[in-house]
Curated annotation (Swiss-Prot):
InterPro entries: CDO_1 (IPR010300), RmlC-like_jellyroll (IPR014710), RmlC_Cupin_sf (IPR011051). The keyword tRNA-binding does not apply. PANTHER family: CYSTEINE DIOXYGENASE, CYSTEINE DIOXYGENASE TYPE 1. Binds 1 Fe cation per subunit. Although there are Cys and Trp residues in equivalent positions with the residues forming a thioether cross-link in the eukaryotic homologous sequences, no thioether cross-link is formed in this protein. It comes from the Bacteria. The keyword Oxidoreductase applies. This is Cysteine dioxygenase. It comes from Bacillus subtilis (strain 168). Optimum pH is 6.2. Its cofactor is Fe cation. SUPFAM superfamilies: RmlC-like cupins (SSF51182).
Length: 161
């Protein structure tokens, strides 16, 4: 079975899903890493490849490819909740808190192949690939992404005395 058909079967009937529903459904895709290969895009307008492969009124599914030593911007997902499963490599997920126009780093952790990360409504984060191999992940958001906010990362300034 092709990835699109698996997604339709697994996600097509979901109505107003929770983060747990999204994670459970993602993990049900058989051979997700292999089935996702034809949908992996190289970077174009962003520092990473992004391919929206499925969308209905309830959710949107995207394949993300972050090349070695690249990262996303610091962002939120608007009014959407989400879940992402790492299919290849590992990613560093950095959580931020808003300080107005800027965002301040709060916490970071690695997500390894086969593991999921969740995004609750209002979560601000950045995904990075600090390794020498690409990182590929499969993301599902509900409702479909709209009105995302990109934040300027607040860097620590060290003073010389």
């Amino acid at each position: 079975m092709e990835l699109y058909e698996c997604i339709q079967d697994i996600f097509g009937g979901l109505k107003n899903p929770s983060v747990k529903d999204l994670a459970t459904s993602l993990k049900q895709i058989p051979n997700a890493a292999k089935l996702s290969q034809p949908y992996i895009k190289e970077p174009d307008q962003y520092a990473y490849g992004r391919n929206a492969i499925y969308r209905n009124n309830e959710l949107e599914i995207i394949v993300i490819n972050i090349p070695p030593n690249k990262e996303t911007t610091v962002h939120d997902h608007g009014q959407s909740i989400g879940c992402a499963m790492v299919l290849e490599g590992k990613l560093l997920n950095s959580i931020y808190r808003s300080t107005g126009e800027h965002a301040e780093l709060s916490n970071s952790y690695f997500v390894h192949e086969g593991e999921c990360l969740i995004s609750t409504k209002g979560l601000i984060h950045k995904m990075s690939n600090p390794t020498s191999e690409r990182m590929v992940s499969l993301h599902v958001y509900s409702p479909p992404l709209e009105d995302m906010t990109v934040f300027e990362e607040q860097k620590e300034v060290l003073e010389n005395s």
